[in-house]
């Protein structure tokens, strides 16, 4: 697989040259492969959201480069708008950005600005709605008549309709109830698997990241603390705790069982993995305790 995004010595400074100067991102270098689903974690203020906003030119680096398909996105500043079609950004609580008369028009807005029209536009809108689980009957409704979860899905569909090469999701499940979180996460996973586009998922939920991410970016105090496969990151629980982060709850439970002498594997990150690991023990012993 080819490299779709490369960050070279990337830094960003808020309030540069003032008494309030703060280096939010400090000398970050990494490469992201086409088709990966990358999780992004870090405590509040770690720099993860600032880093994501530099990927599509919403923020311009103080130092370093963002390379998209091998080209510096700031090579031609007047064309930075084109980068934002290729790297789609979904902010936290994106439903507050809905504004059109109908859900259909809202989803179509970005794709129209990219130049789609006619049947191609209609197909893009309906495919994006399908990916995010919006029923066709909702498309002619006002977006303000939708439920909270439906608004969230409509806003995400508007970015998906542009067919970005890279989709950046900043806390997409924030504020949703457990069912809404589950539905949205499943739809993001389906989109990634079927479209083979690169997805970056920022989340405070270690459980969500553990379920879907191929690799994880860990940010701490503006620096890149780790960028490793998911199992490797969560294997380093002591290090994560120093960054104010935790391993998934099910991982803690399985580690406790190992300490009690039960023959369960290391690196269990999800409930499904735990079920597969514990079922043979239950069948053999009849009970755990």
Show where each model-derived region lies.
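Catalytic Walker B motif of ABC-type/P-loop ATPase nucleotide-binding domains
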Residues: 167-170
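Conserved ABC ATPase "signature" region
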Residues: 119-137
């Amino acid at each position: 697989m080819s490299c779709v995004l490369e960050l070279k010595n990337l830094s960003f400074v808020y309030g540069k040259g003032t008494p309030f100067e703060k280096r939010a991102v400090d000398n970050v270098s990494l490469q992201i492969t086409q088709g990966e689903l990358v999780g992004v974690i870090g405590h509040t203020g770690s720099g993860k959201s600032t880093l994501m906003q530099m990927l599509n030119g919403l923020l311009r680096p103080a130092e370093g480069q963002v390379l998209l398909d091998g080209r510096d996105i700031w090579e031609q500043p007047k064309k930075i708008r084109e980068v934002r079609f290729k790297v789609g950004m979904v902010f936290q609580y994106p439903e507050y950005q809905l504004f059109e008369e109908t859900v259909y028009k809202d989803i179509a807005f970005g794709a129209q600005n990219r130049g789609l029209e006619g049947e191609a536009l209609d197909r893009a809108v309906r495919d994006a709605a399908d990916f995010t689980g919006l029923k066709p009957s909702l498309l002619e409704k006002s977006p303000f008549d939708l439920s909270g979860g439906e608004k969230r899905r409509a806003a995400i569909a508007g970015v998906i309709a542009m067919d970005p090469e890279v989709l950046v999701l900043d806390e997409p499940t924030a504020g949703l109830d457990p069912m809404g979180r589950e539905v949205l996460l499943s739809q993001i996973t389906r989109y990634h698997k079927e479209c083979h586009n690169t997805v970056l998922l920022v989340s405070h939920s270690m459980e969500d990241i553990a379920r879907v991410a191929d690799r994880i970016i860990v940010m701490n105090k503006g620096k890149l603390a780790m960028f490793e496969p998911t199992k490797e990151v969560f294997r380093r629980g002591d290090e994560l705790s120093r960054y104010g982060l935790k391993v998934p709850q099910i991982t803690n439970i399985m580690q406790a069982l190992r300490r009690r002498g039960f023959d369960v594997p290391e690196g269990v990150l999800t409930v499904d993995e735990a079920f597969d690991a514990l079922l043979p023990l239950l069948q053999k012993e009849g009970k755990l305790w």
